[in-house]
């Protein structure tokens, strides 16, 4: 068993827990477009964007920060006008005038978008042409690291794919070994998780308490629902629902991602800060719980892929369940049992793309994760052979991987054609 050293674990955590504004798939496309303009040194006359079915599915109906707009063409057009050095915050770096310029670029047909059916998971490619030059940018396996750059047919850099630490490296050890390593990490190096979580919760509370008007009707619903004297579960449901609905509607607030996902970052942050308050856990304990949730999610995604037909609320929820159980002083086996309960409960929830109704899935997963943590600490577990649940956590995840990569391997393609399928009925 080859254990990763502590510094590699910290590097992996920082890679996957990064601040983003807006859904990370449109951000990925915007970064590709921004990099092409940076390479050309001028605004291109034409940009061709190609993405995997999974990226298309996730990016086609989600709100773009501060614009009221949706779609990959608009995301790419915004990227052409945004500073690439802003990283995953670039969509919020545009002025209102630049947003209007981006709309003009879309109307004039400067940006073309297509799907590469042969590509899976996280993949985006931008080909931009000026009057004199052509720039090509690829991102593969990462929302933010450029895997290849070409200028006028010559390699101009990249190799970000090689620099990108792979989640699969976590599978060199079993989950129990990973958990021990995570708990041995210095809380000082993990504290950024706590700070990021506090920022998310502060934003959600502002809307919940009426200090900020929501963009999303769904967020308004969560604000109105049982707005006084909520139980822990109801409060977690409402605040996760508010934060996700607002983010998907295009709110310009920064979110610390979890395994590259902002919504899963919200799931971990809100659930564990509120549970920590309920249990009177100190900042260090909550920080460690957040680290457990993040690394657990990464471990499970090493089986399924970061962007797959499996809804991220499932693995993210399992991570929260593990962390809740740890806060309740559960044993390692009980922590695994909590994860198995979530997987047995939610494993058939599919990802049908990023949109405001993700708030329903995330808020449901948050409540079920908290329940699973408490259930496991009370001695409840799912027996092996109960549905998809295996004897060991790793057995369960191998079966989940087979179901989603084999049996449901083409589902992203069909879900990406939802508009077409609806129009033919």
From Swiss-Prot:
This is UPF0597 protein Moth_1414. Belongs to the UPF0597 family. It comes from Moorella thermoacetica (strain ATCC 39073 / JCM 9320). One of its GO terms (molecular function) is L-cysteine desulfhydrase activity. GO terms for biological process: L-cysteine catabolic process to pyruvate. InterPro entries: Ser_deHydtase-like_asu (IPR005130), UPF0597 (IPR021144). Pfam families: SDH_alpha.
């Amino acid at each position: 068993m080859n254990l990763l050293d502590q510094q590699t674990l910290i590097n992996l955590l920082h890679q996957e827990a990064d601040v983003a504004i807006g859904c990370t798939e449109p951000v990925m496309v915007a970064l590709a477009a921004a990099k092409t303009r940076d390479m050309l040194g001028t605004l291109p006359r034409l940009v061709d964007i190609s993405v995997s079915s999974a990226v298309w599915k996730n990016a086609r109906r989600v709100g773009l920060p501060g614009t009221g707009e949706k779609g990959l063409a608009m995301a790419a057009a915004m990227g052409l006008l945004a500073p690439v050095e802003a990283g995953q915050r670039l969509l919020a770096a545009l002025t209102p005038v630049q947003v209007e310029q981006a709309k003009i670029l879309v109307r004039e047909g400067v940006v073309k978008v297509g799907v590469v059916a042969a590509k899976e998971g996280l993949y985006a490619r931008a080909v931009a042409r000026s009057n004199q030059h052509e720039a090509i940018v690829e991102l593969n396996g990462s929302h933010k690291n450029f895997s290849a750059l070409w200028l006028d047919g010559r390699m101009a850099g990249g190799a970000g794919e090689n620099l990108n630490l792979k989640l699969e490296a976590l599978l060199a050890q079993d989950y129990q070994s990973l958990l021990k390593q995570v708990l041995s990490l210095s809380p000082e190096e993990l504290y950024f998780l706590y700070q990021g979580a506090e920022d998310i919760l502060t934003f959600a509370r502002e809307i919940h308490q009426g200090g900020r008007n929501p963009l999303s009707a769904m967020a308004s619903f969560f604000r109105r629902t049982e707005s006084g004297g909520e139980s822990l579960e109801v409060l977690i449901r409402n605040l996760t629902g508010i934060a996700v609905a607002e983010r998907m509607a295009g709110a310009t607030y920064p979110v610390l991602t979890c395994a590259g996902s902002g919504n899963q970052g919200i799931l971990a942050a809100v659930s564990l800060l509120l549970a920590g308050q309920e249990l009177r856990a100190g900042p260090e304990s909550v920080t460690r719980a957040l680290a457990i949730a993040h690394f657990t999610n990464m471990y499970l995604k090493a089986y399924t892929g970061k962007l797959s037909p499996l809804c991220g609320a499932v693995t993210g929820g399992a991570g929260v369940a593990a962390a809740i159980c740890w806060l309740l002083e559960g044993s390692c086996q009980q922590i695994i049992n909590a994860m198995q309960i979530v997987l047995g409960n939610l494993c058939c929830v599919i990802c049908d793309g990023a949109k405001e109704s993700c708030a329903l899935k995330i808020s449901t997963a948050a409540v079920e994760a908290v329940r699973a943590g408490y259930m496991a600490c009370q001695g409840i577990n799912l027996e092996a052979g109960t549905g998809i649940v295996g004897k060991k956590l790793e057995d369960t995840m191998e079966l989940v991987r087979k179901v989603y990569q084999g049996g449901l391997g083409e589902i992203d393609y069909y879900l990406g054609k939802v508009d077409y399928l609806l129009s033919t009925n």
